[in-house]
Structures are given as C-alpha cells and as structure tokens.
C-alpha cells in the first residue's frame, strides 16, 4: 500500500474507490494499491 498525495490508475485493472472519505486505488496487482493521505 502506497500513501500518496495524488492517486491515479497505473493500469487498466486499477479502480478508484472512496472508503471513509478517502480515495483509494484497488487492483488485481498488489503493487498498485494506493491510498490518499
């Protein structure tokens, strides 16, 4: 899980979601997991 100021999709499998007022990226590739902080 990477904590970043700006999250973006890395590949076509990445999906932007909102959880508890936080923008997150979930993907089938675990390296692409990101959280905005």
Swiss-Prot record:
Pfam families: Ribosomal_L36. GO terms for cellular component: plastid; ribonucleoprotein complex; ribosome. The keyword Mitochondrion does not apply. Belongs to the bacterial ribosomal protein bL36 family. GO terms for molecular function: structural constituent of ribosome. It comes from Aneura mirabilis. InterPro entries: Ribosomal_bL36, Ribosomal_bL36_sp. One of its GO terms (biological process) is translation. The lineage of its organism: Eukaryota, Viridiplantae, Streptophyta, Embryophyta, Marchantiophyta. It is found in: Plastid. It comes from the Eukaryota. Keywords: Plastid, Ribonucleoprotein, Ribosomal protein. This is Large ribosomal subunit protein bL36c. SUPFAM superfamilies: Ribosomal protein L36. The keyword Cell cycle does not apply. Disulfide bonds: none annotated. Its main location: plastid. The gene is rpl36.
